[in-house]
Every structure is written in C-alpha cells, then in structure tokens.
Amino acid sequence: MYWYISFLRPPPVSVTISSESLLVTPQVANDLRTELRYEPTKIYYTWQRIAPKSSEPETLKELTTFMPPASTYKPLAIPLSLQAQVEDSWRLGLFSCRSRSENCKDAEPEPINHLLDLVQQPKILGVWSEGIEIIRLPGGMKNGAVRGMGKQKERPEDAGRCARAKKSKEKEKERYDVPKQGRIHRELILPLVRQDQQPSLKIIEQTSFDLDKKVWDSGLALSAWLHEHLSDSMTLPPLGQRILSLLTQKERLKVIELGSGTGLVSIALSLAHPNQSTSRWDITATDLESAMPLMNENLVLNSLGIVHLDHVVDDTISSRLSVDAKVLDWDRPLPNWVAEDPPQLVIAADVTYNTSAFPSLLSTLSSLICPPNDSNARPLLLMAYKERDSGERELWQMLKGQGIDMVKIDEVKGCEDYGFTEIWVGGTDLS
C-alpha cells in the first residue's frame, strides 16, 4: 500500500488579501482514507501561483509532524505567500520527505513525486490543492495590493478597536462561512521520454466518498510498473514479456481498461507511448456514466483525449495515439463498439474490491477474453490486484471456470515494504 497526504479539512475556495493565514487539517492515510499512518510524518507546505501567470513552487517550509491521534482533527494555520496579490490564484502543496527516513535528515524535501519511486523506493505522496483565489473585502484594498502593504492609515484612537473587530470577524468567517474546496491534485514526474521533455502525470481526485473519483493503490502500482518495464522487459517472466511485446509491436494495438475511475492507468500508459516504436495505440478507458466527466477532465489535463490530440503540436504522436473514455457497464452486455473494434489487451486495477459485483465482472471479462468461436482474437488480461479481503480471490476460480487462466508474474512492494500489489496475466491460451 501507499501513504497519501490529503486534506481532512480542505483549504477555502478563496481568501482575502488581508488574511494572514488559512486553516487546513492535513492527514496521512491509505488510498481510501480508512487507515491513518501511525508513524511520525513530517509535513511541509509550499505555495505556487497558477494565475494570471504561473510561478515555480516556493521553498518548502515545515508545517507539522503528523502523528495520530493528536493530529487527526487538528486544524493548522498556514501563512499565505508574501507575494500574493488580489486576483491571483495560488495553490497549496503539502509534501513529506524524499526518502523513507522519518526524520528527513537523509534528504531535503521537494515539492515533487516521481512515478518510478512507487516501484523502487515508495514514498509518501504529496498533494496539491486547487487554485485559491485571492480576493479583497468590499470597500477594501485596491487591485494589485500585496499582502501586508498599501493599507490605509487609521486614526490612532480607532486602530486598536477596528483591528480587534476585523480580526474577530475574519476568524468567524474563516471557521464557519467560507466555502471549502472539493477536489485535490496529484502530480507524478515521469521517466524521461524525450531529451527535450520530462512530462508529469496529473490526476484530479474528488474529496467526496465516491470510489470512482479517487486514486487507488493498484492503479498507481500498475502505472509505475508499466513505465518501468516498457523500457526493459528482460527481467520479467515469459508471460510478462508477452504483455510488453504487445505494447511494443509494430502493428496497431487496441487496449480497453475496465473500471478506470479517474483514468489513471490509461493516462499513464498513453504517456509512455513516445518511448515506443511507430506503432499505433488506441486506448479506451471505461467506467460507469458517473465517472465520465472527471475522467475526461483528466485526459484533457494530460493533453490526451481524441479532441485534444487532434490539435497537439506534435502531429507524429497524435497520429500514433488515440485515447478516449466510454461507458462500459458490467451489468449490461458489451456495447457494440467493443465488437466493432475488439481489444488485444484488457487492463484492470483494483476491480475486485466489491465481491457482490463478481458475477457482473465475470460476465464482462468472459465476453472480452473469450470472444465468439468465429473470432481469431485472443486478448490478454493485465490485472493489478491488492488484497483487501481474502474472499476476493474467489474470482480466480470463477475465471478458471470460464476457461480463463490467471498467472501472477510480478509484485510491486508498497510503502515500508508491506501491502504488495500483485501483477497478473490472464487469458485462454497462456502456453
């Protein structure tokens, strides 16, 4: 498993220029926020302007050491950037150490996470807020005023009374009235794709309890695993090399992802494409209708999606890569577009958490992996699995009953060497 920094109390949508700080409650927990990290975790904060003109993140400053239960619900005041101006938009980042050293003495913290760290030396994942708008109170400071500067002079006899009243009112508003953000951003630096570009993978999550709108461990592990082995598959067993040979073949490749949620794995795979040959990839991320808006937003955020790719600068990449999001409901027969363009590879991560959905999942997988007798297609299944309940493994026997064999080819260690994610290959002909 991995550890994620997130906001139990998120930052506000906006803050006044006269504010000295804003309140958040950070937490360090697992992917579904059901288990807190009961080890001292130093958390650092940074600010980055994102509008009207973006800036580099500011130097990280220590915020707190997260240690439940004392830290679980504790609100913390974070000073605003001294560079903040009215009509700016700034995002807040929370990060921990680069290394697994809990006291951070071995490495300086940085406001970044690397995707390959998740398979090499897992670290605590940082988080970015959405943009926080810097506003002024009605009748307050002028546009362009920098926090702490340009205040109107007050008469000495009124200064103390006004200051106390204003401070009290602002605290009251901050605690009770200010709308809070409902989304967070994760960013992961990818391996060098081209000499002039080192891109990042960007994912928006919602802070609600919607499971299809969060990043899950197995999705991260499979994304990192793909990027690690697409450049070198020789350390994998034959079935693993067979999967990677599909991804590096010269012929066109059709990929369907099941239960894509945020679109993480499809996006990660798509961003690995420039490393490959001149083959064409057509990738379709699927889920229920409720997941489509966020999934499409994440595709666009990463300069993917059919509409966006038609307008990218690099025409070579756009001609070799198609990525889209479509509805695929496991409770219904496969849509016509699947039969019209059947996949050669089906990928899935964290699709086994709901055992009551196994009959529907089994039906969908069987329809994809075991095509009609008149079809020459024999797709392979690449699945990342993290055990959350031992009963989930019943799916393997259910698949075998449908003629689909499953073979484990690798494991990805979690943070602090526990909570493995297993990498499996499935198919009707694995010999």
Language-model segment annotations:
Residues 1-431:
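S-adenosylmethionine-dependent methyltransferases
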